[in-house]
């Protein structure tokens, strides 16, 4: 094992290794070859559930099954074991005179956790349990370590994350959650494809970290002798494709942000981003509403779900509210009538909202929203009209240029989507990038950098475009009632063990 040098072998580990030696001395490979299965334990449960003991005896149906030993008891020349394939268990009845003396000796050496192959016939025991009467027994893989207690699984949450393979063996809820994650991704792709979007792939390594306000991971390309960044968003390359005439595109991929971890944040996570030419942010609201409600219905059978203590109804039509109206409703502060940065700062001071040097009217409105409103939005709510200062890639609102045609979707007090009518004016975009650069000089290290290549692409003409970003991990958390992002990532980023 990989960490044998760092631990002393306890009695169980020693005994299991001695059994490996014994098997090899008898000419038996403890780590076997390919084994062809004709049926799974789950299929046996489904296909033969209504068959009586007599019907099964008469049919004498021969099968080939495999799985991990979860229980085992031996009495003389007879033994019983339950094997597990995923989370479906099947009882195996083993007689020495049926499988032969040599194979029975191997069975007696088997431990919980070993993976075995069985050939035999299906029957029903006197207690009514569907089982397989073995005629052949094959050891496929010897387990050198004992499994966690089968009745209690892994109680140490951190161990579940570090050793996900053990969690999947012992925790049916965890395994089902990852099956649901896979289905959510499939149904998401199906929905986007059916809406006429084309799935594409764009670079993971970027020359400029753009498309979001976040700290990047930095790497170095030796052959080109240049710094590169793991992407913090998918946006800017996808918009280039819209310029190139690919009218509706989407990508589901990993993005990387060199920031802290929490129950909602992991340094690498999965995003869906989509862009549709000749549409705006209101069209994207309709897309998101349809996507989330449809996928929820497909995986849960309903659009009414439970997340933690909350009952959430994802049935369209969802609430839509301007950010300034939301702050007015929940805080009682009317930012529509705030006319200067100084006035906004005074309001922030009065209401204990943190303000830093670079912040202006729009930043402060957003701080009010994040401090007092966001966590109160339990039912699905589109909050639109984000200030221009925090939306460098979004189109200004024609009626009030302090704001943009942008929205975020909030459910159970968390952001689940971010979208806007894309800024397609290259002159305005350059000015926004320059403003972001000034913020960076004033201490905002998450401000957007200048991307000259993207600006050049815009100068060829980006049609009016509706763009969307959805955090797939948060969506999976919501639809599977997972309290932490680590519960829906197979291998979350973890700190080194001491």
From Swiss-Prot:
Q: Where does Mg(2+) 2 bind?
A: 415
Q: Belongs to which family?
A: Belongs to the class-II aminoacyl-tRNA synthetase family.
In the UniProt record, which is one GO cellular component term?
Answer: cytoplasm
> A single GO molecular function, which one?
tRNA binding
Subunit info here reads:
Homodimer.
Would I find Repeat among this entry's keywords?
no
Cofactor(s), by name: Mg(2+)
UniProt cross-references to PROSITE patterns, sorted A to Z? AA_TRNA_LIGASE_II (PS50862)
Under catalytic activity, the entry for this protein gives: tRNA(Lys) + L-lysine + ATP = L-lysyl-tRNA(Lys) + AMP + diphosphate
Question: Binding residues for Mg(2+) 1, per the UniProt record?
Answer: 408, 415
UniProt keywords (A-Z) are: Aminoacyl-tRNA synthetase, ATP-binding, Cytoplasm, Ligase, Magnesium, Metal-binding, Nucleotide-binding, Protein biosynthesis
Record the organism: Listeria monocytogenes serovar 1/2a (strain ATCC BAA-679 / EGD-e)
> Which is a Pfam family this sequence falls into?
tRNA-synt_2
InterPro entries in the cross-refs: Aa-tRNA-synt_II, aa-tRNA-synth_II, aa-tRNA-synth_II/BPL/LPL, Lys-tRNA-ligase_II, Lys-tRNA-ligase_II_bac/euk, Lys-tRNA-ligase_II_N, Lys-tRNA-synth_II_C, NA-bd_OB-fold
Protein name from the UniProt record: Lysine--tRNA ligase
UniProt EC number: 6.1.1.6
According to the record, cofactor stoichiometry and binding are noted as: Binds 3 Mg(2+) ions per subunit.
Compartments where located = Cytoplasm
Keyword Mitochondrion recorded = no
């Amino acid at each position: 094992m990989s960490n044998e040098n760092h631990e002393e072998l306890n009695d169980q580990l020693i005994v299991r290794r001695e059994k490996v030696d014994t098997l090899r001395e008898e000419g038996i490979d403890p780590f076997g070859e390919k084994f062809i299965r004709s049926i799974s334990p789950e299929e046996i449960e489904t296909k033969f559930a209504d068959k009586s003991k007599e019907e099964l005896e008469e049919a004498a149906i021969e099968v080939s099954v495999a799985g991990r030993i979860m229980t085992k008891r031996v009495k003389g020349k007879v033994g019983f074991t339950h094997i597990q394939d995923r989370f479906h268990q099947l009882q195996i009845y083993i007689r020495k005179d049926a499988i032969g003396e040599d194979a029975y000796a191997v069975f007696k050496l088997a431990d919980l956790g070993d993976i075995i192959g069985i050939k035999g016939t299906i029957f029903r025991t006197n207690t009514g349990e569907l089982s397989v009467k073995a005629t052949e027994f094959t050891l496929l893989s010897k387990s050198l370590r004992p499994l966690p207690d089968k009745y209690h699984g892994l109680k140490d949450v951190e161990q579940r994350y570090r050793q996900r393979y053990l969690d999947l063996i012992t925790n049916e809820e965890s395994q089902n959650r990852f099956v649901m994650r896979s289905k959510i991704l499939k149904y998401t792709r199906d929905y986007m494809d059916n809406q006429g979007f084309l799935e594409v792939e764009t670079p993971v390594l970027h020359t400029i970290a753009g498309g979001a306000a976040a700290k990047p991971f930095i790497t170095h390309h030796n052959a080109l002798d240049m710094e590169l960044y793991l992407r913090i968003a998918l946006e800017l390359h996808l918009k280039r494709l819209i310029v190139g005439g690919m009218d509706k595109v989407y990508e589901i991929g990993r993005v990387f942000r060199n920031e802290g971890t929490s129950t909602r944040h992991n340094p690498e996570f999965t995003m869906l981003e989509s862009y549709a030419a000749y549409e705006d942010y209101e069209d994207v609201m309709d897309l998101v509403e349809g996507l989330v409600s449809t996928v929820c219905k497909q995986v849960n059978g309903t659009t009414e779900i439970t997340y933690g203590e909350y009952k959430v109804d994802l049935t369209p039509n969802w609430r839509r509210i301007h950010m300034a109206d939301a702050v007015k409703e929940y805080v009682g502060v009317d930012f529509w009538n705030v006319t200067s940065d100084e006035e906004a700062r005074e309001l922030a001071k009065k209401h204990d909202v943190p303000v830093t040097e670079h912040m202006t009217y729009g930043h402060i409105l957003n701080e009010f929203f994040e401090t007092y409103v966001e966590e109160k939005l339990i039912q699905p709510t589109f909050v639109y009209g984000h200030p221009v200062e925090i939306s460098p890639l979004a189109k200004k609102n024609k009626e009030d240029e302090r704001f943009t045609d942008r929205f975020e979707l909030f459910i159970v007090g968390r952001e689940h989507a971010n979208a806007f009518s894309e800024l397609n004016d290259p002159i305005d975009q350059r000015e926004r990038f320059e403003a972001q650069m000034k913020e960076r000089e004033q201490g905002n290290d998450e401000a957007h950098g200048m991307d000259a290549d993207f600006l050049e692409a815009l100068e060829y003409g980006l049609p009016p475009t509706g763009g969307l970003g959805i955090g797939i991990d948060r969506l999976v958390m919501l639809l599977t009632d997972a309290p932490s992002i680590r519960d829906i990532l197979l291998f979350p980023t973890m700190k080194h063990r001491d």
